[in-house]
């Protein structure tokens, strides 16, 4: 009796395991395959009450497309605003989303040292990521500055949106990433340039660098925060 019970339990376990194995052989067990597109009845998207005809983005590194420790072509092409603009296009967004291209496949990971090093890459032969050997200098944007839609500037804090010092070399707020596409370096501000485009819709990602700098300094320098009265 006990032997038969043991045999039945073993058979049940084997049966369940076999069933689970066969189920796992499903080429799409999570149902992630998208259903076929009905080309005869395309989906129509509506913007609702929003107007996406002139979408602009304001922010820091994530907005600019800064990845792998540098700003370079592929990162800009895959920036969050660029991806968002592509989706908004289906609901009346602009056909082209202009970004201040750096025209560099490697970017610059050490702007304070002459951009001798480019983006970081993962090398399994050494511990941690290493920069590519050659970086490219941060040069002025050669395109039409008045038609830009992405005003992301890597590393900036809230206050740097409001001051012309962000485009003025030698000042504490200076950023070469803004100076390169500023409408009037040393005079214009990021926010002023944004407003001049008369956006119909915008996204804003800013403020995390204010907190991050305070945290990474050991919470010892409250002056790093943007002045709330500014």
Where are these regions (language model features)?
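Bacterial N-terminal signal peptides that target proteins for export
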Residues: 2-13
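Conserved SGNH/GDSL esterase-like catalytic core that processes O-acyl groups on lipids
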Residues: 71-229
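Bacterial Sec-dependent N-terminal signal peptides
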Residues: 2, 19-51
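Sec-dependent N-terminal signal peptides
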Residues: 12-20
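Catalytic nucleophile-elbow at a beta strand-turn-alpha helix junction centered on a G-D-S/GDSL motif
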Residues: 53-69
């Amino acid at each position: 009796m006990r032997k038969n019970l043991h045999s039945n339990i073993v058979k049940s376990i084997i049966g369940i395991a076999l069933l689970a194995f066969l189920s796992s052989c499903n080429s799409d067990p999570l149902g992630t395959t998208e259903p076929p597109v009905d080309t005869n009845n395309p989906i129509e998207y509506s913007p609702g009450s929003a107007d996406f005809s002139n979408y602009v983005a304001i922010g820091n590194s994530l907005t600019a497309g800064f990845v792998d420790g540098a700003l370079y072509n592929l990162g800009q092409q895959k920036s969050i605003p660029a991806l968002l603009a592509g989706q908004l296009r289906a609901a009346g967004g602009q056909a082209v989303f202009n970004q201040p291209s750096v025209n560099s496949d490697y970017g610059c990971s050490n702007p304070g040292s002459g951009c001798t090093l480019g983006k970081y890459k993962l090398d399994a032969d050494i511990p941690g990521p290493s920069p590519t050997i050659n970086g490219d200098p941060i040069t002025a944007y050669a395109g039409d500055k008045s038609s830009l839609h992405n005003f992301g500037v890597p590393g900036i804090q809230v206050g740097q949106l409001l001051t012309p010092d962000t485009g003025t070399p030698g000042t504490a707020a200076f950023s070469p990433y803004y100076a390169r596409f500023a409408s009037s370096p040393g005079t214009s501000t990021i926010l002023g340039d944004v407003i001049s485009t008369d956006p119909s819709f915008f996204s804003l990602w800013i403020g995390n660098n204010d907190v991050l700098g305070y945290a990474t300094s050991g919470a010892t320098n409250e002056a790093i925060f943007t002045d709330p009265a500014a």
